[in-house]
Amino acid sequence: MSTPVARSATRWLACLAWLLAAVLLAGCGVNRPLARQAAARVALERPQQLDCTRSDHCAIASAYAELARRARSDSRAEAPVHYADALEQGNEALLLRVHLIRAARHSIDVQTCIWAEDDAGWLVLDELIQAARRGVKVRILADQLFALDDVDWLARIARAHANLEFRLYNPTFDEAVTQPVEFAASLLCCFSRFNQRMHNKLFLVDGEIGIAGGRNYENRYFDWDQQFDYRDRELLVIGPHAGAQMQASFERFWAHPRAVPLTRLNDVNARIMREPLAAQDLAMPAGVDAARIEALRRRALDATALAALARRMLRIGVVD
């Protein structure tokens, strides 16, 4: 049985917690003057020139792109054609992502919950930036609570290229990085909204080559963690009907009011205004295994090996 002293202490702690939440709430909200200044600096510093002037934006040849062309050609409204393959191996799933990024001609849309600042996370981000520079429209949507807690990275991504857009879903207190005190306050004041996280994972190239399943962007999802790796499964689907469905799903999330551009986040904007951009490249994090990243990049250009993987694709009909 609790004593009067214990009950009184509990009430005081509860009052202090609510007071803390109220103080944090009073200070939340987008700093609009700062946002305008940061947006202006981003517009000024973000490059628009392209590394490629070809109409295909220097996309590499790909057996998967050929399957997409074949599915598009053979499909009819009443009888769509698709190709599908289950991706069981994490390393293979990462290899295909890098290959498909380099094979993209027009657009890449990526949606995820977790994005870590490790080997896999840096590699995919760097490849997406390179795709944007050659003319591909790149959009990334990640959950704020579990993606990229390095404000330096985010400030640099915001200015990487005019073809690259990055949004965070449901940011806490209009910031990219949630501090422990803010996390606790969110649980107290607004748990219902705070708990609405985005767990969807989608990787879509040119609106017709899509990967959906359980993998986020972190070493342990791609068999690259030396201590512990997840066993996940994804489905690679190629074709117009499924591609349109995946595109529509992404667009709904992208247009949602809780999908917030980086220049609407106070901590990112403060970093943008404090540190003029010296270079557009993301620095490789300390401890990253550069050798295995380079090895995977070479494999992503191996047309013979990738064609062998593409031969596993099964021709199917409707995908729902």
PLM regions: where:
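N-terminal secretory signal peptides that target proteins for export/translocation
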Residues: 1-11
